[in-house]
């Protein structure tokens, strides 16, 4: 499949029960996403074209600390930096843009064989690393030998890439372990930076990449300072210095209001109203963002063994109330009980979104005519608004006779605590998991993978196994329209079986000072770029 530029999207009106006006929401017919008009988001001065000004320093509050960041030795490595936003210093073969489309970066073109398991990638020949060395095919091969290494590598490449080889001065060939018709998106993953060739155990430690900024200073666990890469191959950078602050227990909002920060890289939606009233402040809201996943463990004695109870819980949840109350009708979106992001062209809306009468009927059929009390639902504060989201959700299901107690757990060790242990002495818990927006193949694979078992033991089993078979078929299918039909079938299966519930999605929101230009919110918080950002 060759890369193609996206075609302009048409717009159509979308009716919502939240009472929002036509002007407040528009939705792309092909993408299915909701976006605010620019007039609602940006200060009037920011909408005008201006010539970028070079120089200056920008400080932003880091929002998602990298749990693997622990030592000075590895602090510049793309796997172990202070944050998972590696785009400042490293380039990947591709980039996923603000509309979740895959676009060229180090790679200029890519093409798969008919079986979708061999990909040939052409790379740019005008890129230099920070130390002046040219970026070559040999560096791409060496980088992916690291990424796919069983002990040293990163999960996406380890599971997918079998072999990588040079086939020309500007061409590399990937042999995949299994077919993947959307491999171009995998090449954009944030850890899969291209680094100078070296022994695998040494690669990445120097921090030398080909990105728009270079490492200047790292304060482990607290902050990192970057300086402009004057040899950058693309547009920009315009800033002289970029600083990310990620202090333990810091208050980003107070830091912003006191002048510490120029940018809040991830905003609590409850603060949008306050920030809109803050002088010389602009807000940008991405087309999508993370979802809140409810894992429904299915084992002997669990109420979720009964599909009717899973269906009832999904139908009882008032997702529109969450969007209206927590996200102000603007910074949230309705999930469809799959990992799919609503921005994607292959997204299949859930209909009906809520049906309390049907939920009560299903509970009665399952033997609970007077309602049901579910096990405690656990969560950790992955996003600032999570308690508010779950409080509204727990209140909403009472209308169907469902009682659901919620309990917050500390972030430290949460994922290990909520999943089954290696000895299988503990089952997966009825708990929340975060889900980032990616392409359909990555999104839908997560309900098929055994890791962390987000499907809650849905497979092995007839419908779960059928789902996996459909996924494998989609990965062998090169034609996007034929693949869409398969994706729709997979989503219909998920909406019928409800192996997991996706409560709602948030739209990644950033706030910044009005003298900051060229900055756009990104649905993947790890893909936010400062390459073309400048200060007036």
PLM region spans:
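Structural transition elements
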Residues: 300, 331-365, 381-389
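Ligand-site clamp/hinge motif
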Residues: 230-274, 403
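N-terminal secretory signal peptides
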Residues: 1-20, 24, 31, 45-46
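Surface-exposed binding/hinge segments that line
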Residues: 122, 155-197, 217
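Long beta-strand-rich cores associated with HINT superfamily self-processing modules
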Residues: 512-536
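Extracytoplasmic/peripheral linker and loop segments enriched in polar/acidic and small residues
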Residues: 162, 399, 403-415, 443-514, ...
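N-terminal lobe/hinge region of extracytoplasmic solute-binding protein
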Residues: 61-114, 145, 206-209
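Gly/Pro-rich hinge or "lid" segments in bacterial periplasmic/extracellular proteins
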Residues: 79, 84, 97-101, 185-241, ...
């Amino acid at each position: 499949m060759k890369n193609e530029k996206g075609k302009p999207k048409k717009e159509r009106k979308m009716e919502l029960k939240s009472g929002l006006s036509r002007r407040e929401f528009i939705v792309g017919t092909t993408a299915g996403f909701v976006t605010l008009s620019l007039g609602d988001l940006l200060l009037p001065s920011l909408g005008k074209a201006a010539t970028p000004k070079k120089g200056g320093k920008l400080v932003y509050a880091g929002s998602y600390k990298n749990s693997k960041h622990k030592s000075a030795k590895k602090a510049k490595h793309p796997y172990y930096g202070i944050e998972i936003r590696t785009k400042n210093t490293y380039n990947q073969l591709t980039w996923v843009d603000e509309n979740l489309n895959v676009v060229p970066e180090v790679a200029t073109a890519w093409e798969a064989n008919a079986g979708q398991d061999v990909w040939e990638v052409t790379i740019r020949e005008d890129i230099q690393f920070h130390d002046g060395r040219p970026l070559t095919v040999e560096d791409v091969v060496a980088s992916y030998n690291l990424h796919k290494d069983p002990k040293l590598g990163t999960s996406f490449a380890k599971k997918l890439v079998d072999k990588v080889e040079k086939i020309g001065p500007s061409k590399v060939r990937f042999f995949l372990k299994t077919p993947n018709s959307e491999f171009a998106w995998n090449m954009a993953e944030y850890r899969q930076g291209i680094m100078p060739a070296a022994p695998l155990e040494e690669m990445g430690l120097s921090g030398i990449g080909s990105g728009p900024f270079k490492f200047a200073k790292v304060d482990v666990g607290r902050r990192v300072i970057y300086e402009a890469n004057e040899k950058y191959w693309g547009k920009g950078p315009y800033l002289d210095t970029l600083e990310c602050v990620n202090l333990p227990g810091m208050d980003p909002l107070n830091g912003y209001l006191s002048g510490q920060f120029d940018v809040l890289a991830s905003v609590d939606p409850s603060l949008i109203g306050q920030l809109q009233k803050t002088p010389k402040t602009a807000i940008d809201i991405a087309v999508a963002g993370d979802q809140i996943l409810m894992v429904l463990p299915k084992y002997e004695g669990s109420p979720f063994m009964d599909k009717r109870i899973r269906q009832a819980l999904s139908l009882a949840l008032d997702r529109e109330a969450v969007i209206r109350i927590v996200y102000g009708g603007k910074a949230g979106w309705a999930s469809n009980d799959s990992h799919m992001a609503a921005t994607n062209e292959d997204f299949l809306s859930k209909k009906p979104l809520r049906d309390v009468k049907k939920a009560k009927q299903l509970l009665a059929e399952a033997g609970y005519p007077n309602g049901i009390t579910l096990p405690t639902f656990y969560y950790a504060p992955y996003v600032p608004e999570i308690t508010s989201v779950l409080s509204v959700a727990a209140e909403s299901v009472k209308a169907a006779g469902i009682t659901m107690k919620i309990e917050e757990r500390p972030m430290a060790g949460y994922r290990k605590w909520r999943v089954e242990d290696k000895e299988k002495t503990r089952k997966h818990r009825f708990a929340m998991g975060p889900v980032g927006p990616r392409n359909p193949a990555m999104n839908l694979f997560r309900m098929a993978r055994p890791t962390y078992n987000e499907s809650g033991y849905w497979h092995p089993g007839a419908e779960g196994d059928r789902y996996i078979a459909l996924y494998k078929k989609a990965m062998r299918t090169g034609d996007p329209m034929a693949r869409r039909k398969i994706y729709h079938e997979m989503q219909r299966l998920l909406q019928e079986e409800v192996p997991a519930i996706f409560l709602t999605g948030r739209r990644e929101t950033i706030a910044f000072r009005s003298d900051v230009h060229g900055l756009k919110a990104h649905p993947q918080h790890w893909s936010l770029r400062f390459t073309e950002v400048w200060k007036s």
